[in-house]
Each structure stands twice: as C-alpha cells, then as structure tokens.
C-alpha cells in the first residue's frame, strides 16, 4: 500500500479534514522505524465475510529471509460492532488458538493510525496485535483486519454481572482492575506518547480466571503534539473530560486520567458517576458533583469560555456520594483524578503508588478464591525510565523484585 500519511479514521479525523503535521509521528518516534514491512506484512485476501464457519486464509512472513507461512482463521461469532466496523471471534485452524479479528474499512490513501499505534505496543496490560491482513469485497472496498489476542470479558460486563446479583464488586477487584488500567495508561502516555481518547469499561478487557486487565480499541488513539489542534468531540460521553465538553482542542493525556477516574467511581458505585443524556447535560452532571468551576479552572480547560456565566452550584462532598463504609483511600483517589484543571489530576504513574493500592503490594494478597494475583510488578526498564529511586521502591515491593531482575535497589 502507498504510505501517504496516517489515516485520520472516522473517530479520529481531525477538524482540518486534511493530513496535518499533527498526523505525523513526533521526531523521537521516528527512530522506532515504523514500517509496513515489519514481521507482520499485511497481505491482501479476497472476501469480506464474517459469518460463522467462514474460513479466511492469509500468509505471514516472507521478509528478511523468513519463510512464508499460511494461516487460516475460521470466523466463529461477532463479539462487537460500531461505526468503526466489526470485531469477531475466530479460531486459528493451524494452532487451535482463539483470536479476535477487528475489521475496519480502509481508506487506500492513508496508512491506518490504529495499526501504526498497535505496532508500537508491547505491555501485559495492553491487548497485543498478532498480525494483520487486508481483505477486499466485490465492490473493491478494502478492509484492514487486525488479528488480536482474545480476552473473553470486559469490565463493563463484570459491572453488569454484580448489578444483576444486586451486589457490590469486591474491593480487591476494584483495586486490581483500576491498578492495571493506570499501569497501561502510564505505559502508553510515558513510553509511547499516545493518548487513548476512549477509556471506558467496554474498552477494558478482563480474563475472568486470572483477573488480568488489558486495554483495547486504539481506534481513537493519537500522539498529542503540543501546540497542534485535535478534535474535542472524542471519548464516550459518561467518561468525557470537562475540557472536551468545553471544546478544547489542545488537551493532554489528562483526558484519559479523567476517564479512568470515572471508571473507578463506577466500579465503586456500580453505576456511572456522571450519566449525562447529552453533551451539555454531561457538564451539568459534573457540576452537580464538583460544583461550578472557578474562573481559573475554566481558563485551564478552555480560555475562550472565561466570560461565560455559569449557575453557581456548590460542590457535593465526596463522602456523601459514596456509602459510609467506603475506604477513605478510595474516595481520596477519585477526588485526585476528577479535578477540573487537567494539570492538577494525578498522573497515571503517580496513581499507582496511591495508598488505595497498598493491599495489592502485600506479599500475602490473594484473590477471593485464594489464587494468586495476576502479575502487577513486572515492569520493564523503559516503563520506569526517569522515575525517582524512592518511587521505584514503592512501585516494586521487595517481595516482587525478582520480577524485575534489571533493578538495582
């Protein structure tokens, strides 16, 4: 395929409508040599069917002296769909492995930004890209197929499960899920320089046996370049940061932190904290809890709104939003994440060392069924690059340091 630019896909097409400097990779990422001819060369296959039983045959390898290898996938069932396309579960006939295949319509003029991002990612809390291929239809439409690891559940469905039982989610699961969300965000924000822009329970996959969480759906993800505009109509409504509602175009990765704060609150409450019925109503829901933003806070979100007159509403105390038995550490963390001023929100890495997660650092911590927790402290050197020694010592408890043999504490 012609490498003309990175595709501004449907959810990500920026306000200019054209490929701008904001669509180019920042200088420091050029060293990573993102090329189409990586190990996962994208071959083109005919057909665009996702019905149960349909078999897709593609090839991988064949570059840099590697032998070509044929892989066949049998479509099993559709597991998700939206404006982007469709996600279906499939089985690799050669290995028996179950995978998820995300199929999106591809504009031939551009590289696909989601594919470019996925090729950079390698983290235990981020869904991994196995390989990719293109498929064509009779109408000569081109589809990109991302072959991803399959994770059976989502945080959204886990929340619904506990609601049906009329139970609160065990606090250890709330801690586990939220910790892993922040670890994935710290990685994509600090190591890759990418903002996800659609953090929500539906985009957080969970293995129901190990309770390992993986962030998925990078269809809206983007490298945010300081001084360059981005669209503000991004992120699902209940999880949308206030600066986006205010129409800010020069936002930061702090929008993901706000969304993660909303997810944490939802795990604790069993329902969304800010269930707005429209964009404006979303702001009303936020104001009902946080109170009217000050002039200074509005300036931090979008300087163009400072003269706008808002109804003066007092903040609702956090301890009245959560039930009396809620641990104060949980309430404290929510309050540090859901700040109007983006620069005052607790960054993802800082959130990991918050006392709310201390239970997970206990060497005797176990799942409610007595099993071990999923790996939480297996940090790679680049994850902790530039982090002060005292903070590293807190992030990697003594009993877990064998998971990081490169550490010299």
Curated annotation (Swiss-Prot):
Record flagged with keyword Transmembrane helix = no
PROSITE patterns in alphabetical order: PROTEIN_KINASE_ATP (PS00107), PROTEIN_KINASE_DOM (PS50011), PROTEIN_KINASE_ST (PS00108)
GO molecular-function terms, A-Z = ATP binding; protein serine kinase activity; protein serine/threonine kinase activity
The protein's Enzyme Commission number: 2.7.11.1
- Location (main, coarse): cytoplasm
**Origin superkingdom:** Eukaryota
Q: Which reaction does it catalyse?
A: L-seryl-[protein] + ATP = O-phospho-L-seryl-[protein] + ADP + H(+); L-threonyl-[protein] + ATP = O-phospho-L-threonyl-[protein] + ADP + H(+)
Q: In which tissues is it expressed?
A: Roots, shoots and leaves.
Where in the numbering of this chain does the Protein kinase domain appear? 73-357
**Record keywords, A-Z:** Acetylation, ATP-binding, Cytoplasm, Kinase, Nucleotide-binding, Phosphoprotein, Serine/threonine-protein kinase, Transferase
Short name of one Pfam family for this protein? Pkinase
Identify which residues the record assigns to the active site. Answer: 198
Residues bearing N-acetylalanine are: 2
Q: Does the keyword Kinase apply?
A: yes
Question: What the entry says about post-translational processing?
Answer: Autophosphorylated mainly on threonine and serine residues.
**Location of the protein in the cell:** Cytoplasm; Cytoplasm, Cell cortex
Q: Name one GO biological process term.
A: protein autophosphorylation
Q: Which SMART domains match?
A: S_TKc
Q: Which GO terms describe its cellular component?
A: cell cortex; cytoplasm; nucleus
Where, per the database record, does this protein carry Phosphotyrosine?
A: 233
Family of this protein: Belongs to the protein kinase superfamily. CMGC Ser/Thr protein kinase family. GSK-3 subfamily.
- State the function annotated in the UniProt record: May mediate extracellular signals to regulate transcription in differentiating cells. Probably involved first at the cortical polarity site, to restrict MAPK signaling and promote asymmetric cell division (ACD), and second in the nucleus of stomatal lineage ground cells (SLGCs) or meristemoids, to limit cell division and to promote differentiation into pavement or stomatal guard cells, respectively. Phosphorylate YDA and SPCH in vitro.
**Quaternary structure?**
Binds to KIB1. Component of a complex made of POLAR, BASL, ASK7/BIN2 and ASK3/SK12. Binds to POLAR and BASL.
Q: What is this protein called?
A: Shaggy-related protein kinase gamma
Q: Native species of this protein?
A: Arabidopsis thaliana
């Amino acid at each position: 395929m012609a490498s003309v630019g990175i595709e501004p896909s449907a959810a990500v097409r920026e306000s200019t409508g054209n490929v701008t400097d904001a669509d180019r990779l920042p200088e420091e990422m050029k060293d990573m040599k993102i090329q189409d001819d990586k190990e996962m060369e994208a071959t083109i296959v005919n057909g665009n069917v996702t019905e149960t039983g349909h078999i897709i045959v593609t090839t991988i390898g064949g570059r840099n002296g590697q032998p070509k290898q044929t892989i066949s996938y049998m479509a099993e069932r559709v597991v998700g769909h939206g404006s982007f396309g469709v996600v279906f579960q499939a089985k690799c006939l050669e290995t028996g492995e179950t995978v998820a295949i995300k199929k999106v319509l591809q504009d031939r003029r551009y590289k696909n930004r989601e594919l470019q991002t996925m090729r950079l990612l390698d983290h235990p809390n981020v869904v991994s890209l196995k390989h990719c291929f293109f498929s064509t239809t009779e109408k000569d439409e081109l589809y990109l197929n991302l072959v991803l690891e399959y994770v059976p559940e989502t945080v959204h469905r886990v929340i619904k499960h506990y609601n049906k039982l009329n139970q609160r989610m065990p606090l250890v699961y709330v801690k586990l899920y939220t910790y892993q969300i922040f670890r994935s965000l710290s990685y994509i924000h600090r190591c890759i320089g990418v903002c996800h822009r659609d953090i929500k329970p539906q985009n957080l996959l969970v293995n129901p046996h190990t309770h390992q969480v993986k962030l998925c759906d990078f269809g809206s993800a983007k490298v945010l370049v300081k001084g360059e505009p981005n669209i503000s109509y991004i992120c699902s409504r209940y999880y949308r940061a206030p600066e986006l509602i205010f129409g800010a175009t020069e936002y930061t990765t702090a929008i993901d932190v706000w969304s993660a704060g909303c997810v944490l609150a939802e795990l604790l409450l069993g329902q969304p904290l800010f269930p707005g019925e429209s964009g404006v109503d979303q702001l009303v829901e936020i104001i009902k809890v946080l109170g009217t933003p000050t002039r200074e806070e509005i300036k931090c979100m979008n300087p163009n709104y400072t003269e706008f007159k808002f109804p003066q509403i007092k903040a609702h105390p956090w301890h009245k939003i959560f039930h009396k038995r809620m641990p104060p550490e949980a309430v404290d963390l929510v309050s540090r994440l859901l700040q109007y001023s983006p620069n005052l929100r607790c960054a993802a890495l800082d959130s990991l060392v918050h006392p709310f997660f201390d239970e997970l650092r206990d060497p005797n911590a176990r799942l409610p069924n007595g099993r071990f927790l999923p790996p939480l402290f297996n940090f790679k050197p680049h994850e902790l690059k530039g982090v002060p020694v005292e903070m590293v010592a807190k992030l990697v408890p003594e009993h877990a340091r064998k998971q990081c043999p490169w550490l010299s504490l």
